[in-house]
From Swiss-Prot:
Pfam families linked: eIF-5_eIF-2B
SUPFAM superfamilies: Translation initiation factor 2 beta, aIF2beta, N-terminal domain (SSF100966), Zinc-binding domain of translation initiation factor 2 beta (SSF75689)
Name of the featured protein: Translation initiation factor 2 subunit beta
Protein biosynthesis keyword on record: yes
Source organism: Metallosphaera sedula (strain ATCC 51363 / DSM 5348 / JCM 9185 / NBRC 15509 / TH2)
Subunit structure and binding partners: Heterotrimer composed of an alpha, a beta and a gamma chain.
Amino acid sequence: MSERDKLYHVLLDRLYAKLPKKDLASETQTLPTLSIINVGNTTIIRNFSEYCDRIRREDKICMRYLLKELAAAGSISENGQLMIQGKFSNAIVNTFMDRFLKTYVQCSTCKSLDTVLVKDKKIWYIQCLACGAKNPVKPL
């Protein structure tokens, strides 16, 4: 190797040493599956609060979206369960939650789920914690 190549590799090593280390835990983030049961004419999502905490969204925002899409009434119990009036299949609830993830959680630039929802005046934004992008979304 020439002197120039050695200098190049030394500078490259210094650059990599100064770069922040990637957090592999946030890249391979897996979401819990929704635990959905039907009791009579009521659909209960047992791990709703845990799911909302994992995607960094308030329970009320997720509940508002899901109930609006299902055209149903519902409430969150003290132990974090979402109780929806009406009988809905797992596939329907999961479809709407996947749509919520793609619209209000996933970064449109880098596809990361490591985001926060920010309201600036009357405009809602998804701010990505991985790449720093800030994208407007439809208000909830």
